[in-house]
Amino acid sequence: MEFWLSWVFLVAILKGVQCEVQLVESGGGLIQPGGSLRLSCAASGFTVSSNYMSWVRQPPGKGLEWVSVIYSGGSTYYADSVKGRFTISRDNSKNTLYLQMNSLRAEDTAVYYCAR
């Protein structure tokens, strides 16, 4: 059984600030259960390493679910459903957030969003 992990992009304008904050996600694909996938989220308008950054997801027909967070100091936390399978990380030189997803399951099918 195959399933689709989608990617989208989010654009937000900070209220009262003459600065565009943009998060552009990529890396979705059609994956077999048990497979791996890495999502990327390239940020502009702010510094990823100076903020806490999260991944959330929305399974088909359901609400948003929190997946993982990385704090400015580097501490990481995960939802129980993905712990041990997913890894959040960032590349400060590229101002990019990542989500490495291993041992994927059918229930991981969702649209994934990065969020500041």
Swiss-Prot record:
Region (Complementarity-determining-2): 69-84
Disulfide bonds: 41-114
Annotated Gene Ontology cellular component terms: extracellular region; immunoglobulin complex
Framework-2: region residues: 55-68
Signal peptide: 1-19
Region listing for Complementarity-determining-1, in residue ranges: 50-54
Keywords, comma-separated and alphabetical: Adaptive immunity, Disulfide bond, Immunity, Immunoglobulin, Signal
Protein name: Ig heavy chain V region 5A
Organism: Carassius auratus
Record lineage: Eukaryota, Metazoa, Chordata, Craniata, Vertebrata
